[in-house]
């Protein structure tokens, strides 16, 4: 499933997050399939807030949350194709 993944962390944790990001990048490369895939990589929308567009299973997303907790808080919003929704809607009538 595809998601918009919003993230935020405390400004005081910036150096910890930068260090852990290097660890995450290496871990992600060494363990394909363990973590979500990035369709649109992380981007900042503010000082310590950001978003990315990802695709993953619940298990892959759990692995991301486990890796980053408690440094970064995430909120995942599912993305659905409008055409499929409209098709299903029309069938329900």
What spans do the regions from the language model cover?
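Short S/T/G/P-rich N-terminal loop/turn motif that feeds into the first structured element of a domain
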Residues: 1-49, 56-59, 81-93
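A common structural microfeature
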Residues: 49-51, 73
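C-terminal structural segments of small proteins and small subunits
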Residues: 63-88
């Amino acid at each position: 499933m595809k998601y918009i993944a919003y993230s935020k962390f405390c400004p005081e944790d910036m150096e910890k997050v930068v260090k852990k990001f290097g660890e995450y990048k290496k871990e992600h490369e060494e363990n394909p399939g363990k973590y979500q895939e990035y369709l649109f990589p992380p981007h900042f929308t503010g000082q310590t807030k950001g978003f990315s567009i990802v695709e993953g299973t619940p298990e892959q997303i759990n692995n991301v949350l486990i890796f980053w907790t408690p440094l970064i808080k995430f909120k995942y919003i599912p993305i659905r194709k409008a055409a499929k929704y409209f098709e299903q809607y029309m069938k329900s009538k």
